[in-house]
């Protein structure tokens, strides 16, 4: 029960932040920029926390709060999928491919950046 409350608190904060970021960042070049930004932020945080936990002790409760709760609500693959599918439905083939590429590559890069920053700061 304690774990569910911890996840819920993180999820509450992550969901609100996602709503705010998605609402204030308009689409650029026909690409859903808000979703892209929250996915980059979430990927960085996951990379940072997961690699930090290899150097310092991060309690399971904090990992649940940050990764499962906060990042789980902040980032969203379902919204990314819907928005990407909408681009292909509207025959926006270049935007469709661009959206997939920048989201996947951007998030992989942010995992790496989070890892590097974590290992640099904590050593």
UniProtKB/Swiss-Prot annotation:
Topology of this chain in the membrane: Multi-pass membrane protein
Activity regulation annotation text: Na(+) is not transported, but it plays an essential structural role and its presence is essential for fluoride channel function.
Catalysed reactions, semicolon-separated: fluoride(in) = fluoride(out)
Entry keyword annotation includes S-adenosyl-L-methionine: no
The encoding gene: fluC
Keywords: Cell membrane, Ion channel, Ion transport, Membrane, Metal-binding, Sodium, Transmembrane, Transmembrane helix, Transport
Spans through the membrane: 5-25, 29-49, 65-85, 94-114
Source species, domain of life: Archaea
Protein name: Fluoride-specific ion channel FluC
Source species of the chain: Methanococcus aeolicus (strain ATCC BAA-1280 / DSM 17508 / OCM 812 / Nankai-3)
Positions bound to Na(+): 72, 75
Localization: Cell membrane
């Amino acid at each position: 029960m304690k774990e569910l409350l911890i996840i819920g608190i993180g999820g509450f904060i992550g969901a609100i932040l996602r709503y705010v970021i998605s609402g204030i960042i308009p689409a650029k070049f026909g690409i859903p920029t808000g979703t892209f930004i929250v996915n980059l932020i979430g990927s960085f945080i996951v990379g940072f926390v997961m690699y930090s936990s290899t150097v310092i002790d991060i309690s399971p409760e904090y990992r649940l709060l940050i990764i499962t709760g906060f990042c789980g609500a902040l980032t969203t693959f379902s919204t990314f999928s819907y928005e990407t599918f909408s681009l292909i439905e509207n025959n926006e083939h270049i935007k469709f491919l661009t959206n997939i590429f920048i989201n996947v590559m951007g998030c992989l890069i942010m995992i790496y950046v989070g890892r590097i920053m974590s290992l640099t700061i904590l050593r």
